[in-house]
Structures are given as structure tokens and as C-alpha cells.
Amino acid sequence: MIPALTVPLLFLCATSASPAAGRGVLVPPDPKSKLIPSTTKGTHAIAKPTPSQAALRHLMVPADNFGLEMLTDHQRTRATHPQRQGQDLALPDKTRAKTKVTLDNNTGPRKVNSLSNREALAGAQPEGRNFIPSFFGNSKVHQDRSQLSSYFQLHTKSSSLTASQNLQGRKYSRNNDYGSMDHESNRPGKMNPHREEEVVSNSTKPAWVINRQPSSVLFQRPAFRKGFDNKEMCIAECHRDKDEREAYCNSDFAVNGIVQDMESVGKESRLLTLLVSSDGLYKMNRLYISPDGFFFKVKILVTDTLNCHKPCLDFKPGVRYIIMGQIYHKRIIFPQAMQHLLGGRLRAGDGFIKSSSYVQRFNRKRGRKVLAAAHSKCR
């Protein structure tokens, strides 16, 4: 028999030891709980609560809501289903590494399996394009690269075969198709389908025979045509005022110097030796000059291309001239008679002028115009 005074004391001790004390809820003491003596003398510790007691404590509803923290959904699920913790720990290492934590509307951390998302996305792809995700996967990289390269190789081969078949199937006629030819196909670097047969037939010949035209400046000049004599053209060309800037831009060299020597090469040509100072070299490019004391020697071939009664380019020894012309090179082809008369006296790099070239006596006004043309930009 327990005395009547000890029952209220035990009831008060149980209520003070419970976590819900002071919150308006009374919890009766558990008869299975025991007092375990601690290591220190005169003190006692309560035994660790069982999982059922911990779940009951978390699920208790407070009497008043003032100063109480709300429980999250995650904590409630863990309290009501404690066996799920063991399931999370039992997951394999690979699956646990592929999970990532996300937040959804501040309801707490949730685990999302990235592997399941990938499988769902792969299942949503259409069946006709099943090869596309395999190129971007982490496994079988070498096989995917070989598939991709083979796909593009087949595509290029098929396109080239179709283009060649279309080109072979067409038959062009020169009379009908040249009028409707596209100008874009006539650009350099593009194949002209109208001349396909000519290219095939001339493939055995060297390139310089097929593509090269005679680069002679004198090839179609009137001086080498028989019976050419036009007085009006001679007067117009010889007495025409020529623009310094236009002549400077259209010429390879521009100098002013004194005629030192003059040799006749046949009836229509002369070979000049010009003494030029350093100030008289307006434009040189690859003009060949040889030093001679304080001056430079320049050789210039003069040809009368108009074949007039009186030479259009009239030079006198000891007179200073402004001359603009072209530079001779080996691709310029002279008639065989003139080549025999020159006899190697004209070398590559020497000057070459004709009747339409700029030749004027030097004065200060013309000298300033040529200097202005030298400092201006050509169009």
C-alpha cells in the first residue's frame, strides 16, 4: 500500500520531467521507465526514450500556439515512418551519388533522382531520332563518334554523286544556252558547265597553252599593221593635254631627267639613256637604275605606235623631260625584227613608253602637279 501523501508527489515529478510540461498537456508517467544511477554521486538520469515515445512527443499538439515552432513535413514523415531512414542508408553508392537536393516552394529539401529524369526524357523523344541522344551520352563515346562521322560521310558522298549525275545528264548547246548563262557561274574559281567538253579534250595540253593569252603590249598596236596612217588620230594623240594624276596612276614608273644618249632601233623605235637625280624619282616600283656619279642612269625604249609621218614623241639630247610609262618584262613580246635589232640591249626592269604615254618638258608647274599626284590616292 502506498501512502496517500506520496501519490501527489509522484504525479508532480512525472509532469515536471515530461517535455510537454508548462505547455498545458499532462503526460502520465511510463511505468516501464526506470531511474538509472549516474556516475556522479547523488544524481540520477532518466533513461533514453524509446522510438515510440519520441514519435509521440513530436506528434503532440500544443494547447496554445504562442512561441511554438511549426513542424516541417519532412520532420513529421521521419517521425511517423522511422523505417525510411534505414531505406535511405541502404541505397547503393552509385545511386546516392546521382541524387541531388532541390528546394520546392520552401517546403523542405527533397531528393530528386537525376537518373530517373534522364530515362523519362529519353522516353519522350520520338522514335525517328533515337540516334541523337546517343551522341551526347557519357558511355560509348568512340562508337558515337564513328556513327557521327559515317553519317556525314554518307551525306557528302550522296550529295556529290547526285551533283555529278545531274551534271552528266545535262547536254548544253552553245547556240541556245550562252544567251541564258548565269553571270555568277562566270566568276573566277567556278566551273563553267558550258566548257566541260573543252576542258576534258584539252586536259593533255599544258596550262600555259590553254589559259595563257599573249601578254604583248604591242600585239595589236597599229604600228605593226600594214597600211595604217591616220592624220587625225596622230594630231589628236600627239597634241592632247594629258592629266598628270591619271597618267601617274596608270603608269609603272614616273621620273624626270635629262636625255644623255639616244639610239635609233629601226624606223619606229629609239633607245634613250636618261640621267635622273634622286629628286626626280617620283615612282619607281621595279625600275632598274644604275648609279653614275651624282645621278642615276635609266634606259627607256620609245616606240611610235601610231606610225605617223612625224614622230609623236620627239626627244632632243640635253633636254629635261617628265616621262611616265611601263616597265619591260619578259612576258612582253616584240616582233621578231625588233628583237633582232635590240640585240639584248633592253633588259627586264628597263622603261618602256609608247605614243600614248605621258611625255612633257619639265617646268616647275608640271613638277608640282606630278608631286601632288604622287601624294594623292589613286582610284
From Swiss-Prot:
Domain of life: Eukaryota
Region (Disordered): 76-95, 162-194
InterPro entries in UniProt: Netrin_domain, TIMP-like_OB-fold
Magnesium found in the keyword field: no
Composition-biased stretches (Basic and acidic residues): 180-194
Domain NTR: from-to ranges: 234-378
Signal peptide: 1-17
Bridged cysteine pairs (disulfide): C234-C308, C238-C312, C249-C378
Alphabetic keyword roster: Disulfide bond, Signal
Family affiliation: Belongs to the UPF0450 family.
Name of the molecule in the record: UPF0450 protein C17orf58 homolog
Protein species of origin: Xenopus laevis (African clawed frog)
